[in-house]
Curated annotation (Swiss-Prot):
Keyword Signal on entry: no
N-acetylserine PTM sites in chain numbering: S2
Protein name in UniProt: Genome polyprotein
Positions of the UniProt region annotated as Interaction with EIF2AK2/PKR: 2-58
Residue spans of biased composition, Basic residues class: 7-16
Disulphide bridges, residue numbers: C429-C554, C452-C459, C488-C496, C505-C510, C566-C571, C585-C589, C601-C624, C611-C648, C656-C681
Alphabetized InterPro entries for the sequence: HCV_Core_C, HCV_core_chain_A, HCV_core_N, HCV_Env, HCV_NS1
GO CC annotation, single: ribonucleoprotein complex
Length: 737
């Protein structure tokens, strides 16, 4: 038996390291420390055919062409960690168990899961797994699975479109940032707060409890378009607006508490970025905004009516205020930059260790943009406020509305069996629009309105009905009670249909809301141009509410002088509807239900309970509106502009408090550079520029201000939405499909 030691296996430790000849993909090599060019042959990376003289040389191993492969992380602490597709594997095993073939179908190179990332993996796993399961169904599995696969591909195409729309940045790093940016940059066009006083609703600037986002000791974050009103032991106090969604209890009372929150946010964002879990942190940050409950530190109410009557504002004052407040970009940047040296000392000695940690970490990483963002964020929440001016003085001007007496015809009201109509001697139903019927409307000089009080006695005020609540419903089966008359604003008309022209006296007016005259046709809709001379002449009035249909409702007069109406289905504002106590709303009934707008519930000429559309035959159809005042109106319905006149029942002595104001959804015309013309004792739900609040005139009921002065404070402060955006940016949130 040999005593020689057993030969050891060669490893890296017991092998002498000698310089090896290094070969390059192009054919060159290093021999003795000298690089030798390739002998001959094609370009880089292609092996040339040896010549005959070279055949005897040993054949070397061809080096593979180097490829740029994507680095995929294999551990949680590295970026690019792939999400585990447990749902996908589970669907695969479930399909294998259910499959009559015992095999799993293949998607090939077009598998949507190959292109999905992050949240898209979850969506595509569900859609593709569902398609796999459908393919395993016996007999019908092939067609059903094909349809399911097509749907999965469609979902993938939709996800790709969302990714493209949210930005084509590498890795889709800023998709959630851009989506959050779009969600908080836009301010609602109509952010009017509504208060419920058990008997009715009315508009106010006071924030409701649902509008309060977060409460601090001396500051409040709230939704735009309102001002917090606090009831402090019986004393009502309006807080001071600092930004459209930040209010403070007193000037300068803001910075300390908000700085603490920003300190924690910077610390959390830095940790998320360091651990490469920005995706999860960003999703948690966004979702937490919907579930975190703010501590109740104050007793907020809606009894102050803050900033409703702030006084008259001239055009010069508006221009000066715009220069001070609407162009603060350069001033804000300079103010932030000037505070950076001071912040360096204050951050260290003030104990803002979260900010210090974030600055140190991102500085070592070379992320100077994030360092600047942190400094600007801290500079924003640490800035002070300063007073720049006071309120403009109140001015009083007289009523400038033009009162139109309307037409004064030889018309009398006749009561027949409890129903009111005009006298037949005033009618000339055979006249057309170009003859005496139209001319007599304006030039006959006398109207006997002695029967109007009795005629209008069956009409009720809006306050006489019960308040509404819940979801609106349409009443398609309208049955009119005995006390309901078509000349009352609350009269719910029956659905429009086909009306025989023989029974109609004069033209038929329909409202889009602009008044239009409907001509006679046959039942197939072919115009006849005979104005009811033939038995087959009819008015085709059936239509749906605009913008899907032609008009809201129609009004005409029959041959005996009675007013007839038809219209779209009115709105039922309560589920427990009672015909005696409740209202079927055919107009804008805002004070009884905030959702009842004219566009949703309008069923005729009545724009509000006080105002109806003015048209040439208004005094024939509604003779008791002879003393109504005429106002100019501009409305947009389905993108189409309507300019019309409205006749309103309002006089100087009528009460007009906030709870008495109706809503008129219109695009008001201008009285001046700062004043809108609205219907009397109403308001437009378009808030004022710069404040987002309602500003009404103290004494004149048909004026609303289009521009409101801010509470005389210039502010340099970051909104809470921007704090969330900076957190997403600092944490590298990438939540895209």
């Amino acid at each position: 038996m040999s005593t020689n030691p057993k030969p050891q296996r060669k490893t890296k430790r017991n092998t002498n390291r000698r310089p090896q000849d290094v070969k390059f993909p192009g054919g060159g090599q290093i021999v003795g420390g000298v690089y030798l060019l390739p002998r001959r042959g094609p370009r880089l990376g292609v092996r040339a055919t040896r010549k005959t003289s070279e055949r005897s040389q040993p054949r070397g191993r061809r080096q593979p062409i180097p490829k740029d492969r994507r680095s995929t992380g294999k551990s949680w602490g590295k970026p690019g960690y792939p999400w585990p597709l447990y749902g996908n594997e589970g669907c695969g095993w479930a399909g294998w168990l259910l499959s009559p073939r015992g095999s799993r179908p293949t998607w090939g190179p077009t598998d949507p899961r190959h292109r999905s990332r992050n949240l898209g993996k979850v969506i595509d796993t569900l859609t593709c797994g569902f398609a796999d399961l459908m393919g395993y169904i016996p007999v019908v599995g092939a067609p059903v699975g094909g349809v399911a696969r097509a749907l999965a591909h469609g979902v993938r195409v939709l996800e790709d479109g969302i990714n493209y729309a949210t930005g084509n940045l590498p890795g889709c790093s800023f998709s959630i940032f851009l989506l959050a940016l779009l969600s908080c940059v836009t301010v609602p066009v109509s952010a009017v707060e509504v208060r419920n006083i058990s008997s009715s609703y009315y508009a106010t600037n006071d924030c409701s409890n649902n509008s309060i986002t977060w409460q601090l000791t001396n500051a409040v974050l709230h939704l735009p378009g309102c001002v917090p009103c606090e009831n402090d032991n019986g004393t009502l106090r309006c807080w001071i607006q600092v930004t459209p969604n930040v209010a403070v209890k007193h000037r300068g009372a803001l910075t300390h508490n908000l700085r603490t929150h920003v300190d924690m946010i910077v610390m959390a964002a830095t940790v998320c970025s360091a651990l490469y879990v920005g995706d999860i942190c960003g999703a948690v940050m966004i979702a937490s905004q919907a579930f975190i409950i703010s501590p109740e530190r104050h007793n907020f109410t809606q009894e102050c009516n803050c900033s409703i009557y702030q006084g008259h504002i001239t055009g010069h004052r508006m221009a000066w205020d715009m220069m001070l407040n609407w162009s603060p970009t350069l001033t804000m940047i300079l103010a932030y930059a000037a505070r950076v040296p001071e912040l360096v000392l204050e951050v260290v000695f003030g104990g803002h260790w979260g900010v210090v940690f974030g600055l140190a970490y991102f500085s070592m990483q070379g992320a100077w943009a994030k360092v600047i963002a942190i400094l600007l964020l801290v500079a924003g929440v640490d800035a002070s406020t300063q007073v720049t001016g006071g309120q403009a003085a109140h001015t009083v001007r007289g009523v400038a509305s033009i009162f139109s007496p309307g037409s004064r015809q030889d018309i009398s009201l006749i009561n027949t069996n409890g129903s009111w109509h005009i006298n037949r001697t005033a009618l000339n139903c055979n006249d057309s629009l170009q003859t005496g019927f139209f001319a007599a409307l304006f030039y006959v000089r006398r109207f006997n309105s002695s029967g109007c009080p009795e005629r209008l006695s069956s009409c009720r005020k809006l306050d006489d009905f019960r308040i509404g609540w819940g979801t609106l419903e349409y009443e398609t089966n309208v049955t009119n009670e005995e006390d309901m008359r078509p000349y009352c604003w609350h009269y719910p008309p029956k659905p429009c249909g086909i009306v025989s022209a023989k029974t109609v006296c004069g033209p038929v007016y329909c409202f889009t809301p602009s008044p239009v005259v409907v001509g006679t046709t046959d039942r197939q809709g072919v115009p006849t141009y005979s104005w009811g001379e033939n038995e087959t002449d009819v008015f085709l009035l059936n239509s749906t509410r605009p913008p899907r249909g032609a008009w809201f409702g129609c009004t005409w007069m029959n041959g005996t002088g009675f007013t007839k109406t038809c219209g779209a289905p009115p709105c039922r504002i309560r589920r427990d509807y009672n015909g005696t106590l409740d209202l079927l709303c055919p107009t804008d009934c805002f004070r009884k239900h905030p959702d009842t707008t004219y566009l949703k519930c309008g069923a005729g000429p009545w724009l509000t309970p006080r105002c109806l559309v003015d048209y040439p035959y208004r005094l024939w159809h509604y003779p008791c509106t002879v003393n109504f005042t005429i106002f100019k109106v501009r409305m947009y319905v389905g993108g189409v502009e309507h300019r019309l006149d409205a006749a309103c029942n309002f006089t100087r002595g009528d009460r007009c408090r906030l709870e008495d104001r109706d809503r008129s959804q219109q695009s008001p015309l201008l009285h001046s550079t700062t004043e809108w013309a609205v219907l009397p004792c109403s308001y437009s739900d378009l808030p004022a520029l710069s404040t987002g609040l309602l500003h009404l005139h103290q004494n004149i009921v048909d004026v609303q201000y289009l521009y409101g002065l801010s509470p005389a404070i210039t502010r340099h402060i970051v909104k809470w939405e921007w704090v969330i955006l900076l957190f997403l940016l600092l944490a590298d949130a990438r939540v895209c499909a």
